[in-house]
Amino acid sequence: MNQTAILICCLVFLTLSGIQGIPLSRTVRCTCISISNQPVNPRSLEKLEIIPPSQFCPHVEIIATMKKKGEKRCLNPESKAIKNLLKAVSKERSKRSP
């Protein structure tokens, strides 16, 4: 290979390695805008997501997806009812796993 081809390959490589750290979305923020303190029946849950704090959102976020209509609710992780829900769900999961 001649020097020009090697130089072009090096420049392309350096450019692509710099792109790796750029976020895809400019709207990086917390997922939950408002949170609910209301208790949720574990049987009505389809999915429960716990999102830890990150550089984009300093809060723990708990997102419950309901079986009916697939509605998503953000739950207050500090609420006693939600803490009890998390215990019940983890207890149920531990029964299912061998």
From Swiss-Prot:
InterPro entries with a match to the protein in the record: Chemokine_b/g/d, Chemokine_CXC, Chemokine_CXC_CS, Chemokine_IL8-like_dom, CXC_Chemokine_domain, Interleukin_8-like_sf
Gene3D superfamilies associated with the record: 2.40.50.40
Location relative to the cell: Secreted
Pfam family, one: IL8
SS bond partners: 30-57, 32-74
Signal peptide interval: 1-21
One GO cellular component, as annotated: extracellular space
Modified residues (Citrulline): 26
A Gene Ontology BP annotation from the UniProt entry: immune response
PROSITE patterns: SMALL_CYTOKINES_CXC (PS00471)
Gene Ontology terms for molecular function: chemokine activity; CXCR chemokine receptor binding; CXCR3 chemokine receptor binding
SMART domains from the UniProt entry: SCY
Keywords for this protein: Chemotaxis, Citrullination, Cytokine, Disulfide bond, Inflammatory response, Secreted, Signal
Keyword presence, Disulfide bond: yes
Role: Chemotactic for monocytes and T-lymphocytes. Binds to CXCR3.
PANTHER family (alphabetical): C-X-C MOTIF CHEMOKINE 10, SMALL INDUCIBLE CYTOKINE A
Protein family: Belongs to the intercrine alpha (chemokine CxC) family.
Name the UniProt record assigns to this protein: C-X-C motif chemokine 10
